[in-house]
């Protein structure tokens, strides 16, 4: 989930499917947001305007609330009213965080790429620099995140989500 704030100070909460790590130094992640009929989504508009956002990792405990944020609301309406999420102040950005998220990243806009197909812009790729991160103490052990404790959910396409499944550990060659 991404929280962002509009120029009118409306808190926007939105799910996203296309999210990845770009680099650890500097810590940058990417988020790709599809356009709807060529128009910027509210999240994209907000981030391009404020240069800030907060990324939250969805887990088994909050996936149903996260799904509610996919509602198509008019500009100026907040998805928060559809959820049981609790907004809390962030430390490094002016965008509220969601208390219930076990992992969240406070980010600033590092770069923006308009992705074109046949001359039309179909998506916006945002490169977001992590300024602060928060990891719940009960899922962080000996410098590692406990994947079972996190119980992360992945947003797929349409109505589908997936849980992180079976892990395979393979030693790397020296």
PLM-predicted stretches and their roles:
Residues 1-174:
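Basic, polyanion-binding surface patches
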């Amino acid at each position: 989930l991404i929280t962002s704030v509009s120029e009118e100070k409306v808190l926007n909460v939105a799910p996203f499917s296309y999210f990845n790590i770009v680099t650890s130094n500097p810590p940058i992640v990417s988020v790709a947001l599809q356009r709807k009929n060529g128009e910027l989504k509210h999240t994209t508009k907000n981030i391009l305007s404020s240069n800030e956002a907060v990324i939250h990792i969805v887990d088994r405990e909050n996936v149903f609330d996260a799904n509610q944020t996919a509602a198509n609301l008019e500009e100026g309406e907040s998805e928060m009213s559809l959820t049981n999420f609790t907004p809390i102040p962030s430390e490094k950005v002016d965008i509220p965080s969601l208390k219930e998220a076990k992992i969240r990243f406070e980010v600033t806009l590092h770069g923006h790429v308009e992705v074109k197909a046949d001359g039309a812009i179909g998506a916006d790729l945002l490169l977001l620099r992590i300024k602060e991160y928060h990891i719940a103490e009960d899922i962080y052990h000996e410098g590692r995140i406990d994947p079972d404790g996190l119980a992360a959910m992945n947003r797929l396409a349409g109505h589908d989500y997936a849980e992180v499944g079976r892990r395979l550990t393979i030693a790397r060659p020296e």
